[in-house]
Amino acid sequence: MAITKNMLVVLLLTIIFVTSSVHCSDSALGIGIKEDWEVCFSIDPCLTGEGTLGCTKWCRNHINLSLVGYCRTDPEHCCCVAEK
């Protein structure tokens, strides 16, 4: 069976279609090109004195593993941000 010109065109178009329909995405929901994503919560780690380590642990357990947390003191909040 010979490979005809029509088969080559169909194969080429199929490859182009498949590669153009592949979407790249981050593993973190809501985090894309804009890397300064941040969300803050009034939760226990910062209120009970666990500090930044407790806040990071909370962010990774409740939102996404690729986040880090820090405590803000105005008022007492745990803020989760994307790692840079």
From Swiss-Prot:
Q: Which domain of life is it from?
A: Eukaryota
Provide the family line: Belongs to the DEFL family.
Q: Which cysteines are joined by disulfide bonds?
A: C40-C80, C46-C71, C55-C78, C59-C79
User: Any one Gene Ontology biological process term?
Assistant: defense response to fungus
| UniProt keywords, alphabetically | Antimicrobial, Disulfide bond, Fungicide, Plant defense, Secreted, Signal
Protein's name according to its UniProt entry: Defensin-like protein 116
Chief site of localization: secreted
User: Its GO CC terms?
Assistant: extracellular region
Q: Where in the cell is it found?
A: Secreted
Signal peptide positions (record): 1-24
